[in-house]
Design a protein with these regions (language model features):
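Short, surface-exposed charged micro-motifs
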Residues: 59, 63, 93, 205, ...
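Extracellular/periplasmic, surface-exposed regions of secreted and cell-surface proteins
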Residues: 1-305, 452-536
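Flexible glycine/proline-enriched surface loops and loop-helix/loop-strand junctions
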Residues: 184-186, 345-346, 356-357
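Glycine-rich, aromatic-lined ligand/substrate-binding cores of catalytic
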Residues: 351-388
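Conserved small-residue
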Residues: 45-52, 241-244, 258-354, 385, ...
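Short, flexible active-site loops
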Residues: 345-347, 359, 371, 448-455
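Extracytoplasmic gating/loop element in the C-terminal half of outer-membrane beta-barrel translocons
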Residues: 113, 380-485
Length: 536
């Protein structure tokens, strides 16, 4: 007999007031409001335990259930979780426009979080704001006639979010019979702050030559600080801190061109480009000034780690390397088995950053009478992708690489012999060296679930034909201005360039550090379709 009880409740409400007015050359818009959220969750489960400590196995027929009759000396027969949370917010925005030439706007938001009420001498609310301005320079200044529109813009904003509420007393296991909470495995969070992002953007939009050419350019600089992080403390306790400061800055460019020499033909092309530079400015420090070490293992004892180090970038990848002779620099090999030695547990070889700095896209639309043809090419330059699939195939000797190595050994009479002369196996040269090792031992050393990372980390640069479509419109098919458009389309057709043996866009999970990771992922799919669109 198991008794399980679950109850959850959620409530959300908001309100908004708006005011708009025009005074001669000025237009004013104001919005103000607030929101509130309440949620609660209560769950507990009881499993009867005999005095011996073992669960009951015989059938039980009960007509009365009393908590005090349950044997409570075992921690295995009960469990529970209780969470309560609330958030409150007030906000306001204002916008002032002068003669449709200059616009200035700003916003203010104040948030209250229940999570912060759990700490003494701390105000549970935090304020954020933003401000921006834009100017239509073609309406303010006399510009060359080739310039149809020129807009300048700039903005600054702050946004934030609470620390998780369910880390502390609001979320703990409890004994449903006594109501007592079981001590948490979390060490007190000292001086908590909300995660905050401060962003600045500036750019311009311009249209030229009867708006046939359009350009947009934006520069951005965003700093994330007080990031919520978890570290392992003494005796299995968990330490939670706000720490670190990360900067993202870059540019975004968009260009378009429209060529329409007559009413029967037009060509519209669009190009976009983005560059992002990420840098970890500071990392969290202990009270004695020592830096916290924050890293994410790509898998249990995988030998591949994402490390967050001051001066580095988010997504820096490190891996285990071979053990080398301190004098000659040669890879150390076991003389009896021929297996190269690895520096297990020491993921110190930097292999690059997993994130691409450059992304691009180019689309084209050709219209001729009632026909329309469209295609999109996109890609990215840089970044790394990891294939555990290739590592496991090598480990089990089922990859083309291992087959080629065995064939080369047989065709070239290349063999490895153990130090005592007892064992002889097909051999191979360790890539880049003159050292001969057994084919099987080499690939079972560098492959598998704990690989020598450099062998299975690939450049993620790629370009592909992302989408293509052909459409025809039957005009006035159902009457005046009642048309039917038939189109055939395909997505993700093929790569124009790729270096990795897998799709660089593959992702094992949405969790941190699990993007760009392949572990026997499903093959990349192409899609084909036909669509009908009727307009009346």
């Amino acid at each position: 007999l198991i008794l399980d009880h679950t109850k959850s409740q959620d409530f959300y409400g908001d309100f908004m007031l708006s005011y708009n007015k025009t005074f001669k050359d000025f237009t004013i818009g104001v919005n103000a409001g607030g929101s509130m959220m309440n949620s609660s969750y209560d769950q507990w489960m009881i499993t009867p335990i005999a005095k011996s400590g073992a669960p009951y196995t015989e059938d039980l027929s009960c007509n009365q259930f009393v908590l005090s009759d349950i044997y409570l000396n075992s921690s295995e027969n009960y469990g529970g979780l209780t969470t309560k949370n609330w958030e409150r917010a007030i906000f306001a925005t204002a916008q002032v426009t002068w003669q449709d030439k200059v616009t200035v706007e700003g916003s203010y938001r104040d948030d209250w979080y229940r999570a912060f009420t759990q700490f003494k001498d701390m105000d549970p609310h935090f304020a954020y704001y933003s401000a921006g301005a834009s100017a239509q320079m073609n309406k303010i200044l006399v510009l060359p006639e080739q310039i149809n529109e020129l807009k300048l813009r700039a903005s600054y904003s702050e946004v934030g979010n609470s620390i998780p509420n369910n880390l502390f007393l609001a979320s703990a296991k409890r004994n449903p019979a006594t109501g007592a909470y079981i001590s948490s495995a979390i060490i007190n969070f000292k001086n908590p702050k909300p995660e905050t992002t401060q962003s600045f953007e500036a750019g311009f939009d311009i249209s030229l030559l009867d708006r046939s050419i359009s350009l947009q350019a934006t520069y951005y600089n965003a700093i994330m600080k007080n990031q919520f992080m978890k570290y392992e403390g003494a005796a299995g306790k968990e330490i939670y801190i706000n720490g670190g400061k990360v900067r993202n800055q870059g540019i975004e460019l968009t260009a378009s061109y429209i060529f329409a020499p007559n009413n029967n033909f037009s060509w519209i092309t669009n190009f976009n480009y983005a560059y992002n530079d990420n840098k970890i400015l500071t990392v969290a420090r202990k009270q004695n000034g020592q830096k916290y070490i924050h890293e994410i293992d790509m898998g249990n004892l995988s030998g591949l780690k994402i490390k967050f180090e001051e001066g580095g970038s988010y997504g820096d990848l490190y891996a285990v390397d071979f053990m080398r002779d301190e004098i000659t620099g040669e890879i150390v090999v076991d003389p009896q088995t021929g297996a190269p030695f690895k520096l297990n547990g020491q993921a110190n070889e930097y292999l690059g950053n997993m994130n691409a700095k450059h992304t691009l896209g180019w689309s084209n639309t050709f219209n001729y009478k009632d026909f329309s043809f469209y295609f999109l090419i996109d890609g990215k330059i840089g970044g790394k992708v990891i294939s555990f699939t290739e590592a496991y195939l090598d480990y089990f000797g089922t990859s083309q690489r291992t087959a080629d190595a065995r064939d080369y050994a047989l065709n070239n009479n290349l063999y490895w012999t153990s130090e005592d002369g007892v064992v002889t196996k097909p051999g191979m040269y360790i890539p880049g060296t003159n050292q001969v090792v057994p084919v099987d031992q080499y690939y079972q050393t560098i492959g598998g679930g704990s690989p020598v990372g450099r062998n299975y980390v690939y450049d993620a640069t790629n370009f592909r034909l992302r989408e293509i479509s052909l459409a025809y419109t039957f005009r006035n098919l159902f009457g005046q201005s009642k048309n039917l458009t038939v189109s055939a389309n395909a997505r993700n057709l093929f790569f124009l360039y790729i270096d990795a043996p897998i799709d660089p866009d593959t992702s094992l999970s949405t969790q941190n550090a699990l993007g760009n990771v392949d572990i026997f992922s499903m093959p990349t799919t192409r899609s084909f379709g036909i669509s009908l669109k009727a307009s009346f």
